[in-house]
């Protein structure tokens, strides 16, 4: 590939036979596309070809760098569009006039079945000239729609491509007032070649020209067509929460109402004083039933009980509990020693004291000795049961507590305690009392026999 200067020189030179032959050959071979596509003459210069050509000056090197950045940006924008869904601005549709629309042809989005072949040079139009490439043509003297080309809607017509409209030649004054070049959108008669750099919709693929950028102008004539999208590629709108003011939002404060973050000691002291004064004022204005002011102190007995703080009810309760404890202690203190044994021991001591008080000599008619001998009951006495029953009735008449007793024979024990009156006569003991009595009887019998033997042999 030749450089840009050589290409322009060749392009501006008069037509030759070789050029006509080459042109006819191209027209004969190009039979695949069904329509006509209008592009700039230098659009077929690809980026890959620009890498291999000879770089003549710094300006051309800068232009190549711009092309590389444009291709890289197109790839990034394509991937970015696939990642995020665009949020379009609300569309306001205005009524359109019945007259035909003479605005420039709109571009259409590329179809999914587009041709991925490399770019081809466009056919020569009847009204084309051999002048250098120009930016896209907009009529400066037209009173029709001068709005930028629109994007194709999803519900647009999917009919076969139609031949493009003819674009008239512009005047030099209109070209001088133009804004920087924009990327051209795909036309109805465009081929399905790979997508080009679409950073600017109405620009061609040639290196950008150095031209002073002029501000966008608005036409005075009213445009009744629907609103179009911006010429620049709009990035997807990210809906974010509006960040509230950190000074007025509670997120910048602690649970106590103080400000968080890095502060000086003076600010902390002032804020603490203000908060303390605010709380004191709020407590003073609060009702006594809510705040608990002037209320009597209630002490918990188990946790906060102290000496000298008992009430009258507590003192009376304490006295009752002490008295009952002494009674139970007096009643059960001898249960581990045997109640019957203690009573017998007490009666024996009283009898010993009485005998000690009697005179040394005792006569036959001693009344105390005779009464004692009458009260003693013997097992062999036939009158023993009658006397025992008489004594029982006498005790009941005196109002004494008399328990019923068992009437019948039972195995004797070392304490001489009779079984209860409800006993059924079955011995349920472990035999300890019987063994103990047998051992005691054997010992007594052996002693008696030993004593008799000694008396006989002496």
Swiss-Prot record:
Disulfide bonds: none annotated. InterPro entries: Bud13, CWC26_splicing_factor. Residues 16-37, 81-328, 437-458 are annotated as: Disordered. Residues 262-356 form a coiled coil. Residues 138-148, 219-243, 266-284, 314-328 have a biased composition (Basic and acidic residues). Keywords: Coiled coil. The keyword Coiled coil applies. Residues 175-185, 208-218 have a biased composition (Basic residues). It comes from the Eukaryota. One of its GO terms (cellular component) is U2-type spliceosomal complex. The keyword Coiled coil applies. GO terms for biological process: mRNA splicing, via spliceosome. Belongs to the CWC26 family. This is BUD13 homolog. The lineage of its organism: Eukaryota, Metazoa, Ecdysozoa, Nematoda, Chromadorea.
